[in-house]
Regions:
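Conserved DEDDh/DEDDy metal-dependent 3′-5′ exonuclease domain
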Residues: 101-188
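Acidic, Mg2+-coordinating catalytic module of metal-dependent nucleases/exonucleases
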Residues: 182-253
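Acidic, low-complexity intrinsically disordered tails
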Residues: 254-259
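Conserved RNase H-like, two-metal-ion catalytic cores of nucleic-acid enzymes
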Residues: 59-127
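Short beta-strand->loop
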Residues: 79, 132-134, 193
Length: 259
């Protein structure tokens, strides 16, 4: 067999088995404090328009709610299809603290740290917390419910009020926009145009590359992508609640300030 053909066949077999080797890298820096082995935590604040104490959620067919009950959340996962084999390797959450949007992120750098991440995230939810997401009812919440079940932990998301912004966005603009993805909503409503953004579809590869000894660069880009998702969730919510964020102001406030 010609050497070239042998190498091609070997490469194909590696890809099928998911054993593709990744060159080792010196760039292994994942930001944040290590809460426990393999679990990193970051906290940052973003200047943003302060919501009123009570938010009119009629646009989502929900009762008015206090802004300090809101927890915007978003996950980055090992696959986009869901299912029991898919896990979240990053959970981001944002809430209002002292007139600013606090952004917290949990990232696991080993599979063994997943249970610690799930426990930590559960501790961020109070009895009256209202969840805010974008397609979270169909994707993020069911995925996390599965992971809590497999970890034999109570599911802290079960039975909570959940404002999924995708549904009111679709009702209002599905006939006007090319699609109702969050990137489209943030551009149309907030004037946010992302630069050097890592698409969510590339997040699984970024994490797996890091696990195999590769560079952390794209994993840091995943964290930046997740943080912008959280800021946009808050901005879209305020817009739809009748507090349209001026486009120039929104663009000026896309910078996240780390504490």
């Amino acid at each position: 067999m010609p050497p070239e053909l042998r190498r091609l066949l070997q490469r194909h077999a590696q890809l099928k088995r998911g054993l593709t080797t990744v060159p080792s890298s010196r760039d292994r820096d994942v930001p944040g404090a290590e809460l426990s082995p393999g679990l990193r935590y970051t906290e940052a604040f973003a200047d943003w328009l302060v919501p009123p104490r009570v938010i009119d959620a009629g646009f989502a067919r929900m009762d008015p709610m206090h802004h300090d009950r809101l927890l915007h959340f978003d996950t980055e996962t090992t696959g986009l299809a869901g299912g029991t084999g898919t896990r979240a390797f990053m959970i981001g959450a944002a809430d209002w603290q002292g007139g600013r949007l606090r952004i917290r992120q949990l990232t696991i750098t080993t599979m063994a740290a997943e249970t610690a991440m799930l426990r930590t995230f559960a501790g961020w939810l109070d009895e009256d917390t209202v969840l805010v997401s974008y397609n979270g009812k169909c994707y993020d919440a069911p995925l996390l419910a599965t992971r809590y079940r497999l970890a034999r932990l109570p599911n802290p998301l079960a039975g909570r009020d959940h404002l999924d912004l995708l549904h009111p966005v679709r009702r209002h603009w599905k006939h006007e926009w090319p699609n109702c993805r969050l990137a489209t909503a943030e551009r149309q409503l907030l004037g946010v145009v992302r630069e050097d953004d890592l698409p969510g579809s590339e997040a699984p590869a970024a994490w797996l590359t890091y696990l195999r000894g590769g560079s952390a660069r794209n994993l840091r880009r995943v964290a930046a992508h997740n943080a912008q998702d959280l800021k946009s969730l808050a901005g879209v919510l305020l817009h739809m609640a009748g507090m349209a964020v001026p486009i120039a102001e929104a663009r000026a406030r896309t910078r996240c300030i780390t504490r």
